[in-house]
Amino acid sequence: MQSQYSHIVLGLGATGLSVVRYLCGKGITPLVMDSRRQPPGAETLASSFPEVKLIAGGFDCRYLVQATQIIISPGIAMNTPEVRAALDMGIEVIGDVELFAREIADRKPCVIGITGSNGKTTVTTLVGEMLREAGIAVAVGGNIGIPALDLLKENADIFVLELSSFQLETTHSLNCVASTCLNVTEDHMDRYSDMDAYRKAKLRLYHQSRSIIFNRDDALTIPTEPMNQNSFGLAPPEGDEWGICDSKIYHGHSEIMPITEVSLIGSHNHANLLAAMALVYAVGVDKQVMANVARTFTGLSHRCEVVGVKGGVTYVNDSKATNVGATVAALDGLSDHLGDIILIAGGDGKGADFSPLEEPLTKVTHLITLGRDGNKIAALKEGAIKVDSMAAAVAKAAQLATSGDIVLLSPACASLDMYSNFMARGDDFRSQVEQLDGE
């Protein structure tokens, strides 16, 4: 055993590799540990950084307690016993986003930060598109796509970061020009002791921002103390707020565009659009530019994505709805639809309370459930249909639906009980829809 490694990277994968790449670029050779016996990225580490040692299958406290700094991947909880032991000894434990923040500390604020239980990726992508349309050099990543440290290679004037609660736990000095917490609904209760702990992790972002944008329709996003703040919401705006009045988007008294010209479907996505507009306004983007992007941006895969129309029935893939709040938002967003809604839900509930689904399920004509916790969701609606596969779910939905109806896959659960990830689940749904008869 080497007597000491000053820097230890806990957790490999894309984030861990980005940390190794960054540290080696600084002339620091870290030690990497991962609890998995065959962590993703191990082959890349061995070929690209042969000088970096990997300990797989667990965390070795003998190394941890001698480190100067531990960089922890967001998937590893801070209360992991080995991490707790290092913290108790006063060893600094931070995440990759904190390393990123320290690297750009001498620059004027150049980060737009986006967190929330749902809608983060849509808003992050929208903000990036609006900045590009405005001619601003932008780099987009964080919790999606490219890890924050890898964005440093890009010649960007603005960094747009999607940030999870896990990442924010270990981030302290991210100097954002603007940030938002889009919403706070129950999620990751297998990691947090209660909703308050989860909310506090999210709202850590506010204290690292020059300007904050909160959701006035969600009280849990409101700052706990006065800040330089503004809000967005679906109701008519007051003062300088962002909102909707007479089916038009407004900033204060300034009309931006009719909501009928927006390509995104669902009121929850209209709220996402308002948040994106408020964020880019903070860095000087023209409102006409915002409107241009809103007219052409149709959304992301697996997020209320229309994957087919068969026999007049619209099939919508919302596989990214991995928690209850996301499915509630999807159902609320489609509540103005005139036809019936047939919902396919279920999967790994991650210890969630499903009771908030009970009222939104009254808007659903038929409920089809599958997966580990499908029975818990089925118990919320009389006449729910239980199946054991996506093929069976789509076939049953197609049998029940008539022209003008929507079949919505919005699971309210994670996918890992049946699939490798939510994308694979959504792809299966799409594949089953494509195999249906009818145009």
UniProtKB/Swiss-Prot annotation:
InterPro entries xrefs: Mur-like_cat_sf, Mur_ligase_C, Mur_ligase_C_dom_sf, Mur_ligase_cen, MurD
GO terms, molecular function: ATP binding; UDP-N-acetylmuramoylalanine-D-glutamate ligase activity
Catalytic activity: UDP-N-acetyl-alpha-D-muramoyl-L-alanine + D-glutamate + ATP = UDP-N-acetyl-alpha-D-muramoyl-L-alanyl-D-glutamate + ADP + phosphate + H(+)
Pathway where this protein functions: Cell wall biogenesis; peptidoglycan biosynthesis
One protein family per Pfam: Mur_ligase_C
Protein's UniProt keywords contain Nucleotide-binding: yes
EC code: 6.3.2.9
Keywords: ATP-binding, Cell cycle, Cell division, Cell shape, Cell wall biogenesis/degradation, Cytoplasm, Ligase, Nucleotide-binding, Peptidoglycan synthesis
Annotated residues for binding of ATP: G116, S117, N118, G119, K120, T121, T122
Subcellular location: Cytoplasm
GO biological process: cell division; cell wall organization; peptidoglycan biosynthetic process; regulation of cell shape
TM segment ranges: none
The family this protein is said to belong to: Belongs to the MurCDEF family.
NCBIfam families for this protein: murD
Function of the molecule: Cell wall formation. Catalyzes the addition of glutamate to the nucleotide precursor UDP-N-acetylmuramoyl-L-alanine (UMA).
Full protein name: UDP-N-acetylmuramoylalanine--D-glutamate ligase
Organism: Shewanella oneidensis (strain ATCC 700550 / JCM 31522 / CIP 106686 / LMG 19005 / NCIMB 14063 / MR-1)
